[in-house]
Amino acid sequence: MFRTMLNSKIHRATVTQADLHYVGSVTIDADLMAAADLLPGEQVTIVDINNGARLETYAISGPAGSGIIGINGAAARLVHPGDLVIIISYGIMDDAEARRHVPKVLFVDAENRIVGQGGDPAAALPGDPSSLRGDVLDPAGARGLGGGA
């Protein structure tokens, strides 16, 4: 059996530009692509934290060190400059490899510079009081997102 597993994610990247009339894709700073183990043309999922939009496209490399996260083509109707996004890649692997696999998890600042990295897909950025681990419940609804009983 093969499993589709998280290969990498760039967490809370800031969209720097959007171009509706570009042919398509997402332009990602080459340094971020390398750190996230992304290849040009690789399929990625983009999740917009601001509005909940979720879409699939492919990655293209932008200038290294530029911090660019550019939404191209029709996706520019869903994701806008200034939006926070999670860029996710998946890998297909056999069961044994999936059980050993450690994803690359990147945390970036407002300029899309790497400020933390690891291999725990549920991890929150250390020292960031505005985020919770993905495997922690918020039963009191303290985040204001409708949590609680």
Swiss-Prot record:
Catalyzes the pyruvoyl-dependent decarboxylation of aspartate to produce beta-alanine. Is synthesized initially as an inactive proenzyme, which is activated by self-cleavage at a specific serine bond to produce a beta-subunit with a hydroxyl group at its C-terminus and an alpha-subunit with a pyruvoyl group at its N-terminus. This is Aspartate 1-decarboxylase. It is an enzyme of class 4 (lyase). The active site is at S25 (schiff-base intermediate with substrate), Y58 (proton donor). It holds the Pfam family Asp_decarbox. SUPFAM superfamilies: ADC-like. PANTHER family: ASPARTATE 1-DECARBOXYLASE (PTHR21012:SF0). Keywords: Autocatalytic cleavage, Cytoplasm, Decarboxylase, Lyase, Pantothenate biosynthesis, Pyruvate, Schiff base, Zymogen. InterPro entries: Asp_de-COase-like_dom_sf, Asp_decarbox. Pathway: Cofactor biosynthesis; (R)-pantothenate biosynthesis; beta-alanine from L-aspartate: step 1/1. Belongs to the PanD family. Heterooctamer of four alpha and four beta subunits. Substrate binds at T57, G73, A74, A75. Its EC number is 4.1.1.11. Its cofactor is pyruvate. The modification Pyruvic acid (Ser) is found at S25. Binds 1 pyruvoyl group covalently per subunit. GO terms for biological process: alanine biosynthetic process; pantothenate biosynthetic process. GO terms for molecular function: aspartate 1-decarboxylase activity.
